[in-house]
């Protein structure tokens, strides 16, 4: 099994959050209050609870706000490094940009605006057992038509990335959490904008020497794209429908958290 202490977490928080304007003019999307805490708090607490210690925040927009809030990470039991993009590099470029700051051979990469209940330890175990080069978290959704789908075979290997369609071949969608071998990250082009979804993954899939697997579950998942998502996500966190170790035991309508 993979010891989580030998895994880096990379959180992509570079986006401007234009769908959330005017909310995001004052703060980057991952810093918006969600159930009384900055949204990113919930993800960082899940990373810490999984036993991962070293976190790299890949930022571009209002980067100083993150460091002012989380500092070196010690309050959360983490060691946080900050890597700032001089210009937006996209999801793939944001991963490639942190390569020099990785401490380990395995990196768990998180899209910073997803609220998820996936079991990170289980996903790591799956990645190790499969001897996978890249593992994507795939979540089953009731109506996949709003999303691009990802098909897998009986062995868990990813077979195709399918654009949005009215007739999806599967209910599995890319849930925005990935595990990469460091060697794969080092192959991503640097210094330019790269999309992990549109460029990196299709290229890896076309390479017979690379094993790309899908870790499939049906846990809580929400892409926090719109103001409505923040309202619903906050309510789900407060009610315990969306799990967050940051809200230790304080469930129901009345709750408090450590200031």
Residue ranges and their predicted role:
Residues 1-6, 114, 122, 129-130, ...:
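Left-handed beta-helix
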Residues 32, 108, 177-178, 194, ...:
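Residues that recognize and position ribonucleotide moieties
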Residues 93, 110, 173-175, 180, ...:
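A conserved catalytic-core signature of glycosyltransferases
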